[in-house]
Structures are given as structure tokens and as C-alpha cells.
Amino acid sequence: MDLRAFPKMPASQLQRVVESAGSFATSLNLSGHRSLLPTTVESLTGCLSVVHGAKVTPPHNQLTYLNMSGCSMVTTSSLHHLLTQSPFLETFCVKGMPAVTNETCEILSQHCPRLLSLDLSQCKSLTGAGIRLFASSAVTRAMPLSLVELRLSGLKSITDRTMSALGEAAPYLEVLDLSYCRDLHNSAIDAFVACSEDFALDSISLTPRQAGRNPNEGRRYRRRITRLRHLSLSYCVLLTDIACSHLAHAMPQLELLELGGIGSELKDDGVVRLLETLPKLRKLDLEDANDITDNVLQSITPHPSSDDIRRDHCVPGHALEHLIVSYAIQLSNDAFLALIRNCPHLRVLEADNTRISAAAVKEFVKLARERKSPDATVVAIDCRSMNEGVVKEIADSTRPRLGWRAYEARRLAYLDGRDEDAVGVGQDECDPYRVVLKTFASWQTVDAVAAARSKRRKGWRRRDANTSSGGSTTEDALPQRSRWWSPGVRRSSGMNSPSLLETNNDRDGCTIM
């Protein structure tokens, strides 16, 4: 039952809907129901119970998916009452709920052993102690957590012991979000991947040089080989590139790495050491890393190959699709050009406020068109060389916004070449093979289209006002407008997308009869 579209549904009606599904319900999404009361939650718990109304202990439901993010009025006791009756729960999202406490983690550990996905982001009453308790319980029972996805954005008081227990208890983690954990330190990252010599699962022994330590040390360092595919450490402001060194060789399956917002503490040494061990990397976020140099881009730039089909798939950068290096002011244009030419799958490049040149942007646009990359995007805002002349030069291959055809996008008034909406300016914003170019000059095109539409609409109104009652109507004289979604009009054969221009009608929405 997906009820997120009805956040103001009365409690009586909500209970009636849930009661109709009863114990057969396996999914419940109450995201955004800010007025949901604790008494209502307790009533819903009874409705979902397999044995509700019967004197059988303990009652339980069959929920495998539960999303209560944003339910700010729910109390801790009512939430725990529901969780104690959800033994089959696999996906649990309570993002931003003040009712979530450290005790909630204990309840999850005892009553929800099948959890695969857990989102406890931005829960102000939760601290690292609760996560340590959650992980330590699994270690004590010698039963590793089944968790594949864990999101803890904004968690407070994360210690080395917390990360060590989590690393030991959750060997199957593929997605880990620790963004905005502002007291997360390098040593906690080290504790997460460190393991003893008798570690039962996959591990690797590293030399001091490989581990980013003093090469003169005589010892070796053992690291767990994790299954992580997505790691987010964005805005963990206490981290440095030393944390990257700790993670090197420990994440061979990683595809998405987010290190944005850390700033100048990210240096070349640790970042390069990590990137050289990530052959499957598809997205890299290094926003605000203003101290990195060309060495970082070179570490993810495959060597030129005359035969793209036989390109080595073990080379970092061969799978790179999305790169964010905004405000990395020390990166040279030559490094950008080499990256653009040698990363065959590069589809999104965000390089605002960098030294990227107009030539590099033109090369990206040309190669994206040749490779037929859908929805390719280049962001070059506040780049000195990207002036209005350059934008006009490549206007035939670009668009200012990533438009799409849907009723939800109607108010955004995307310019669609499939509509009979010739305004004389702008580019087709719904053509997936046009490259999205975001610059100050390209955004002016959006304003120009809006101004042209407004001017044309005013002209139509004046002509309509001057038309005599016996003459032809304005609608007959004007070209056919978009009929994709007009009140009371049957949808046409389907090629026209929504438009903000409503001829002879200033109001959007339903027509009152």
C-alpha cells in the first residue's frame, strides 16, 4: 500500500484502507504523513496483525517493506510496538523521524532479523552508540547481519568502536551512506576495514607503502575485502585523504564514490592510491576538493587504445560515467581533454568554476553525439572561457535543460521539438541525444523562450479581443497548439507534449462546469 501521495488523509479513512488489506499487506508506505498520530499507528498495527482480535501471543504481521520517513508526530513507543510485530521486515525507512532512538536499534536487532535495507538518516535522537549496539548484538550471537544497504546520513557520535563493530557484523554491505557525519574521523574508517589475521572471510595483506604508511615499517596491514558498491562520505569534514588510503584495496567492487564537500583536506596521495584500486568506478564526486591536481584525473584516465573493443576492463576509468570536480581549480585543461577522449562511457561532467576550456567542452559535446550517449550533460558555470559566442557555436547539438515529457513536467514548460510550438528561439529540451549544457549564457536561452511565449500569448489576446463576433475566431487563425493534456479534449495521437500556453484561457487545471 503506497499512501505517500495522501499525506493529509484522515485517520479514520487511513485505518479503513489498511483494514481492508488486513494481514495480507506486505508493503506500507506512509512517507510524509506528518500528522500521523501515535494512536493511529497503534490502530494500524492491530489491523495488520495476522492474529489481531485473537488471544494469541505473540501477534505479528507480514510486512516486508515499511516507510515512515517524515512521520514527526509518531512516538517511540508506538513505533516500537509496530516493529515488535514485524519479524519479516526487509526494508525499513524512518528518515528524519525524531521517534527513532538508540533503543530502536535494539528492537530491530531482536525482532527484525531479515533486514536487508535500513535507512536511519537524519534521526536526531539516534547516536553511534545505537548502531554499535545493533552491530554488537549480531557479533555476540555469531550471526552476521543480512544488511545490504545502510544509510546513516547525519549520524552523531560515530566512534572507532562503532565502525569496527559495524565492519565485523555487516560483511554483506553493498551501500553505505555516512554523509554529513561531521565527527567521523580517519581512524574510524581504518577500524571499519581492519581485521585480524584469523578473519574468516576475504581479506588482503598490504605492505606499509600499499597501506599509505611509512615504507620503513616492518609490519604488514590486513584489510577486509568488502562488497561495497556505493560509499558516500560527503561532507564528513574531519576526513582527509588518509581515509582514502585506509580504503585502498578494500573495495574492489565499488561503483559509486562520493567525497564531495570535504574540501582542501583531500590531497593527491590518498585519493590516487584509492582510485587506482577501483576498476569498476562509474561515478566519482570530488566537489570542493580544491587541492587536487592532474594526478587525480590521470589515475582514472585509461591509456589511449586504437581498439576500443579490446580495451582493458581492469583499468580504472574504463567504466566512468559521471565525474564531479566542481571548484577543483588546479586541474588543467589538458587533463580534462585526455579524460574526455579516453573514458568511452563518460556521460556527465560537472566542472563548474574550473579551468576547463571551450575546446574541452566542444570535444565533450562532439564525442557525446558520436557515442550517442543519452542525456549527456556538461556543467561549466563560472568557467572563464564559456562565453555566449561558444554557446551559440554549439547550439545545434545542445540544450539548456534536461527536459522530459510528463504531466508532472507541465509547469516547467520544456521546449519540445515534437510540438507545434515554434517560438523562433531556443533548443529542443526533450531530445535525449542533445547534450545538456549548463552555463550562464545557456540559461539565458530559457529566459528568451519564456519571453517569446509571453509576447506571443499577449498578441493572441489582443487579436482575440479585436475579433468581431461574426468573423473567424482567433483559434481558427492560429496554428494548432499542444493538445497533449487539455481539459475536456480527447488526447491526440500522442506526439504533443504539455505546454503552458492555454489559448483563450488564463487558468490551469480543471474546468468548473
Listing of model-derived features with the role each one plays in the protein:
Residues 9, 36, 42, 72-75, ...:
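Leucine-rich repeat
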Residues 23, 34, 58-61, 69-72, ...:
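Inter-repeat linker/turn residues at the boundaries of leucine-rich repeats
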Residues 161, 179, 186-260, 265-513:
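C-terminal capping region of solenoid repeat domains
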Residues 18-19, 45, 49, 83-84, ...:
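Ankyrin-repeat helical core positions
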Residues 3-16, 21, 31, 43-54, ...:
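The feature captures the LRR N-terminal capping module
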